A protein has these predicted regions:
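Helix-biased detector of long, well-ordered alpha-helical tracts
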Residues: 1-224
Length: 224
């Protein structure tokens, strides 16, 4: 596969590896809300380090909002689109909610990578959303140095079923919904060191949406 088609070669990091380091991000955001306006309807905001923000609608329901996008963690464009969409949608399910609509975020080096490959990325994201009956209603795109793709997702959750990181208790068991080691597989894939079977396993794991999060929120005794 030529570099023009190997999406992972167009970014320094891949997947979560492209995120700004926590210490740098903490410094960037420090003091942003000091003496700022307080919004009582916001139950979870950017000071909670959670999967999505939460707005209390006042009728027993809450609105969930998240945005997540990545640089390529795989070379297959459709899988990249599906994986990025799955990650964003999973944020809503993780808090006990269900996504109701999404918007796409696309950055693409239009002079470097064929636009037909970008179409495959978009198709992957749409396929993931359609598979869960989540309308992909629009989005925003820019001409960027690195290819990026993701979703901004809106969801709903019953307030009584809302689950946040802060609700976890010291005696809780931890349920792992995906196998560990995805980052290592992705790194091997980027370096061309993974075989066909490993790539297949990576694709299957990355495109799995954690819908089980919403189901677990229905169980008495599940705190976070």
């Amino acid at each position: 596969m030529e570099k023009s088609q190997r999406l992972t070669q167009y970014s320094k990091g891949s997947g979560c590896g492209c995120k700004i380091q926590p210490a740098v991000l903490g410094n960037l955001l420090s003091g942003m809300r000091e003496n700022g306006k307080v919004y009582p309807e916001i139950l979870v905001g950017n000071d909670h380090n959670d999967d999505a923000s939460v707005y209390d609608l006042g009728n027993g329901m809450c609105l969930l909002q998240t945005v997540d996008f990545f640089t390529p963690m795989v070379d297959d464009p459709e899988v990249f689109g599906m994986a990025s969409a799955a990650n964003a949608l999973s944020d809503i399910y993780a808090m006990g909610g269900r996504p109701i609509m999404a918007n796409a975020v696309l950055g693409w080096p239009v002079d470097e990578i064929d636009i037909e490959i970008a179409k495959k990325v978009l198709q992957g994201g749409l396929s993931c959303c359609d598979g869960l009956s989540v309308p992909l209603v629009g989005g925003h795109s820019i001409d960027s140095r690195d290819p990026i793709y993701g979703l901004s997702v809106t969801g709903l959750v019953e307030k009584a079923k809302l689950r946040t990181n802060a609700m976890a208790k010291a005696s809780d068991y931890i349920a792992i919904t995906k196998p560990l080691g995805i980052g290592m597989l992705s790194a091997a894939h980027k370096r061309g060191l993974s075989d066909e079977a490993q790539n297949k396993a990576l694709y299957e794991i990355l495109t799995q949406v954690n819908t089980i999060g919403a189901s677990l929120a229905d169980i008495n005794g599940v705190h976070a």
